[in-house]
From Swiss-Prot:
<keyword id="KW-0472">Membrane</keyword>
<feature type="transmembrane region" description="Helical">
    <location>
        <begin position="9"/>
        <end position="29"/>
    </location>
</feature>
<keyword id="KW-0793">Thylakoid</keyword>
<feature type="transmembrane region" description="Helical">
    <location>
        <begin position="88"/>
        <end position="108"/>
    </location>
</feature>
<dbReference type="InterPro" id="IPR038430">
    <property type="entry name" value="NDAH_ubi_oxred_su3_sf"/>
</dbReference>
<keyword id="KW-0618">Plastoquinone</keyword>
<keyword id="KW-0812">Transmembrane</keyword>
<dbReference type="GO" id="GO:0008137">
    <property type="term" value="F:NADH dehydrogenase (ubiquinone) activity"/>
</dbReference>
<dbReference type="GO" id="GO:0019684">
    <property type="term" value="P:photosynthesis, light reaction"/>
</dbReference>
<dbReference type="GO" id="GO:0030964">
    <property type="term" value="C:NADH dehydrogenase complex"/>
</dbReference>
<dbReference type="GO" id="GO:0048038">
    <property type="term" value="F:quinone binding"/>
</dbReference>
<dbReference type="InterPro" id="IPR000440">
    <property type="entry name" value="NADH_UbQ/plastoQ_OxRdtase_su3"/>
</dbReference>
<keyword id="KW-0934">Plastid</keyword>
<dbReference type="GO" id="GO:0009535">
    <property type="term" value="C:chloroplast thylakoid membrane"/>
</dbReference>
<comment type="similarity">
    <text>Belongs to the complex I subunit 3 family.</text>
</comment>
<keyword id="KW-0520">NAD</keyword>
<keyword id="KW-1278">Translocase</keyword>
Amino acid sequence: MFLLHEYDIFWAFLMISSVIPILAFLISGVLAPISQGPEKVSSYESGIEPMGDAWIQFRIRYYMFALVFVVFDVETVFLYPWAMSFDVLGVSVFIEALIFVLIPIVGSVYAWRKGALEWS
């Protein structure tokens, strides 16, 4: 039989953690001063007046480097627990981790050969 009262603490935590942000937004909406003006609709760039158009397109090259960074960053996050328990796991898990590392490396070499990482 599934006992619902075992999860009372979870449901209380869920309700409290949902109510607190909602109350914070409601209270700040009621107490905040309403001010309209040119400063309210202007772009904010570290306290400096924006120069030119606020909408500047970034080149796709930035996204390529960001994507490569994210792939290797996520790979590092997944490899860290494996490295901490390396002595317990054994050779089969080492081979799996090696394959896991080789797949992004092969993908990076392929992208490099195709010119996806060229800056020009």
